[in-house]
Amino acid sequence: MTKPNHELSPALIVLMSIATGLAVASNYYAQPLLDTIARNFSLSASSAGFIVTAAQLGYAAGLLFLVPLGDMFERRRLIVSMTLLAAGGMLITASSQSLAMMILGTALTGLFSVVAQILVPLAATLASPDKRGKVVGTIMSGLLLGILLARTVAGLLANLGGWRTVFWVASVLMALMALALWRGLPQMKSETHLNYPQLLGSVFSMFISNKILRTRALLGCLTFANFSILWTSMAFLLAAPPFNYSDGVIGLFGLAGAAGALGARPAGGFADKGKSHHTTTFGLLLLLLSWLAIWFGHTSVLALIIGILVLDLTVQGVHITNQTVIYRIHPDARNRLTAGYMTSYFIGGAAGSLISASAWQHGGWAGVCLAGATIALVNLLVWWRGFHRQEAAN
């Protein structure tokens, strides 16, 4: 992939961060609205959870089958095309009259919103080596802020005009972002000689042959499962007694998560300095402890907010560290590395959504917290029992 004479200016970093956040946000507008959507379509909580799962499975499919195209085609054209297609998926969601149609719209939106994961390696390619971790951290902060603020925006818009308004507005914003990206991004032509089947095959071969990639992918999978377990069921908790909050108030809890995400930005800088194993160990410990505060959240809003802050801080910190580490493996194949890592990441998210909805259905908030804490403990043990020693040695 040729590198153009194009300075990665602060303005371009901001544009790419906003675009990344806006793209990935399209998968999460539904989360604070699940209770309202479930009542609209007469669904159970577990059935409504499939809406979020469909978006994440669509995203996982896009990561595997579309993101590698960033190593094959000119990136600006690819990014703009996928942004417009994601906007089209949200139009289907906004006009849906059945659960099946809504799942189709959210799955298509998820499939093409992986444009966010083509923007991240593009930023890493344009950045100088000594600032790569910092730039990746900034772009990834935009991504997680998009996930979290999506809930706040969705709740506020739903209060103003109903849940469909959320998706109409989001579709227009994505179309406008496509125009901004066309004007702002540099052209980058591919130099790979691989065809599409070979490109996909190389994703699997990299995953099989590189233990660091597999390790980081597993950590990401389990970490994002934790994230989804919390956020999928939280709308049900807050809409029920003793809280009885509206969609707008539920969405405001995304601000606490956004604050946690912003606090994780230095993780990329620590990884640049060779401290990735320390950041990972500390982050996974905090992730486990966060579930104690979250458990008390069934009676205390303050405890829930503290738990959200800590969980989102650690999820984002570990994620930034993971990506900074894997981008060092093959600098000329960052889109394929992203595909392998992020496919695992969002499979974890989809599994977490299903686990969360089922845990809420059968065990209430205590069941959700038990599921989250168990997966956090497994994640820590997997890392502690061997993986971190090898990476520290490397």
Curated annotation (Swiss-Prot):
GO terms for molecular function: transmembrane transporter activity. It is a multi-pass membrane protein. The keyword Transmembrane applies. The chain crosses the membrane at residues 10-30, 50-70, 79-99, 100-120, 138-158, 166-186, 218-238, 243-263, 291-311, 337-357, 364-384. Its main location: membrane. Keywords: Cell inner membrane, Cell membrane, Membrane, Transmembrane, Transmembrane helix, Transport. The keyword Cell inner membrane applies. One of its GO terms (cellular component) is plasma membrane. It holds the Pfam family MFS_1. It comes from the Bacteria. InterPro entries: MFS (IPR011701), MFS_dom (IPR020846), MFS_trans_sf (IPR036259). It is found in: Cell inner membrane. Gene3D superfamilies: MFS general substrate transporter like domains. Belongs to the major facilitator superfamily. This is Uncharacterized transporter YgaY. It comes from Escherichia coli O157:H7. The lineage of its organism: Bacteria, Pseudomonadati, Pseudomonadota, Gammaproteobacteria, Enterobacterales.
